[in-house]
């Protein structure tokens, strides 16, 4: 249900109901604006116009696709055309399949992912843009119909919108397939119903304390749950303003994100942990003149481990510009749970728990003072959303863990989705878990590890990524953080740790990308020093490089040994962009491990 300006209630079972309602109640209000250059070049669309576009695209699908319930692949760059494509699929009674469009600089990686998605989803049609249509046709023309949505909207929208007929969809009907990032394997299509999307939208509204006075800004990719459900569907559900920016414009200049929040007076915006680190790493006080972040009341942080150090760095850097530490909103979610699983209090600062790292490695949670030796600071991801049951479960025994114990996070509730498209075996293993002692269920096995304390959820890592050395558990993200902090030449967020079997024992392997600018600068510095001391006569580029490599390798091994009491069996120093990541920026540890075992990684 949705509350409206006049205080009345109206039942909405589908996304079609919601957009129709907005076009009826707020026809001239802006549904979305988009910064085409990431700064000032703004275009927008009203609810009335977006609903008209959705009808037109839906009618085209009804005329050109065999039957309702077919999958439609959406390969459209971020912007207003994406919204028309997504809602057009919904209005046509189809199942939307958003995915990254082919891009020349990432063509090989994206092509293999697209092929895997297409093989599983078997789309009946593909929507893209006129600019990308030739490339998309090369990939898909033999298997399905490809169409440029901008051409359709420019030439046929008025005529088509009158031909639309409301499809027979309900809350139980599938609205979209959300393909997982593939951080632990091939992408799987999570089946989300209209009911899933509306239920989770309501939970987000409650936990963010949103209203029609809220203002949402996002640079997040619309192809993933956080960008699409949390930042595009949420404002539509609320009837509040939304402004978007391309992820590329953010990555090129992170200040654009903060400047947009300031200029547009956004109340809600956020991203993964790395986005906050990037803002601090690229901080330039000269670019921040006049910056005002005082309206930013929900700075959500999720999709990857939330680091206490990141929160401290960002708050210290941007508090002079009006940012409040209480605005930080760490949260936890996953596509299989639609999006949000847990979140904190809007007006409270994040909850930090300081624990003994050694005990955490054995699955025990022992709280200690922050000044203790071997302390690890964990950020709470808040409390379970209303109407959902969340338990910490022993993943092998399938029984609930005792207090102060790490286990797998299991959930059940109306936001839990319908399984994986065309993957019955994986669906049963993941979505149909039962307690061994009580028979309670079914639960969704998230594959994530964590613990509860005073109702707060602390996520510690991924079950499949866990590294076990000499009987002790190590979370790869903890080792990766230690590695990246061990030497200034290592790129932030570009380290991977995993284990391999060597002669019947698990051994630790670390991959670390070396910063190109630092490497070049260090090399020049060494050469200048040798030249000044008259030592350059027999020193060539290779000897200088080997010297720098040795320093970094020693720093990594020493840091991991001291912090984790673990021996690194092998370290590979790599060029930037060598480490495999998902389109959303998560490490693909399994792919990295396979590349290592195949000898496919090239060291600097």
List where the protein language model places each region.
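Conserved beta-loop-beta connector loops within the AMP-binding
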Residues: 364-410, 454
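Conserved AMP-binding/adenylate-forming core of the ANL superfamily
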Residues: 32-84, 104-112, 168, 189-198
């Amino acid at each position: 249900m949705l509350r409206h300006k006049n205080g009345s209630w109206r039942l909405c079972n589908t996304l079609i109901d919601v957009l129709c309602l907005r076009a009826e109640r707020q026809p001239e209000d802006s549904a979305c604006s988009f910064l085409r250059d990431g700064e000032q070049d703004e275009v927008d669309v009203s609810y009335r116009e977006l609903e008209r576009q959705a009808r037109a695209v839906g009618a085209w699908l009804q005329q050109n696709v065999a039957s309702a319930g077919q999958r439609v692949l959406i390969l459209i760059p971020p912007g207003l055309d994406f919204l028309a494509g997504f809602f057009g699929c919904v209005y046509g009674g189809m199942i939307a399949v958003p995915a990254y469009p082919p891009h020349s600089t990432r063509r090989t990686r994206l092509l293999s992912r697209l092929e895997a998605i297409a093989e599983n989803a078997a789309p009946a049609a593909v929507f893209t843009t006129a600019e990308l249509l030739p490339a998309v046709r090369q990939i898909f023309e033999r298997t399905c119909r490809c169409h440029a949505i901008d051409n359709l909207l420019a030439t046929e929208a008025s005529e088509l919108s009158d031909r639309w007929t409301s499809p027979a969809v309900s809350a139980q009907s599938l609205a979209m397939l959300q393909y997982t990032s593939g951080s632990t394997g091939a992408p799987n299509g999570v089946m989300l119903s209209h009911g899933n999307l509306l239920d989770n939208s309501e939970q987000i509204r409650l936990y963010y304390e949103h209203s029609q006075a809220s203002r949402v800004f996002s640079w997040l990719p619309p192809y993933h749950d956080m960008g699409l459900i949390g930042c595009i569907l949420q404002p539509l559900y609320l009837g509040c303003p939304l402004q978007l920016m391309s992820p590329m414009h953010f990555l090129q200049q992170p200040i654009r994100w903060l400047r947009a929040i300031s200029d547009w007076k956004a109340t809600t915006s956020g991203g993964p942990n790395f986005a906050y680190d990037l803002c601090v790493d690229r901080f330039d006080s000269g670019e921040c003149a006049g910056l005002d972040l005082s309206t930013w009341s929900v700075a959500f942080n999720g999709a990857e481990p939330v680091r206490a150090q990141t929160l401290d760095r960002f708050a210290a850097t941007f508090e002079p510009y009006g940012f409040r530490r209480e605005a930080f909103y760490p949260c936890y979610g996953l596509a299989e749970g639609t999006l949000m699983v847990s979140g904190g209090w809007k007006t409270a600062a994040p909850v930090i728990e300081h624990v003994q790292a050694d005990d955490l490695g054995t699955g025990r949670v022992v709280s200690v003072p922050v000044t203790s030796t071997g302390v690890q600071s964990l950020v709470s991801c808040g409390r379970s959303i209303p109407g959902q049951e969340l338990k910490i479960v022993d993943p092998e025994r399938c029984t609930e863990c005792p207090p102060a114990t790490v286990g797998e996070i299991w959930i059940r509730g109306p936001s839990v989705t319908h399984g994986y498209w065309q993957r019955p075996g994986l669906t049963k293993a993941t979505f149909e878990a039962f307690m061994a002692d009580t028979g309670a269920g079914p639960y969704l096995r998230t594959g994530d590890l964590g613990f509860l304390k005073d109702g707060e959820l602390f996520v510690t890592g991924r079950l499949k990524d866990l590294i076990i050395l000499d009987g002790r558990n190590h979370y790869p993200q903890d080792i990766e953080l230690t590695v990246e902090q061990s030497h200034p030449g290592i790129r932030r967020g570009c380290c991977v740790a995993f284990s391999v079997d060597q002669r019947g024992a698990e051994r630790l392997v670390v991959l670390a990308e070396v910063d190109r600018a630092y490497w070049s600068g260090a090399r020049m510095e060494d050469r200048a020093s040798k030249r000044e001391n008259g030592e350059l006569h027999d020193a060539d580029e290779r000897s200088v490089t080997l010297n720098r490599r040795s320093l970094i390798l020693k720093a990594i091994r020493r840091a991991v040994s001291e912090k984790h009491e673990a021996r690194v069996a092998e370290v590979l120093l790599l060029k930037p962009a060598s480490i495999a990541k998902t389109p959303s920026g998560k490490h693909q540890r399994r792919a990295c491990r396979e590349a290592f075992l195949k000898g496919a990684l090239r060291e600097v």
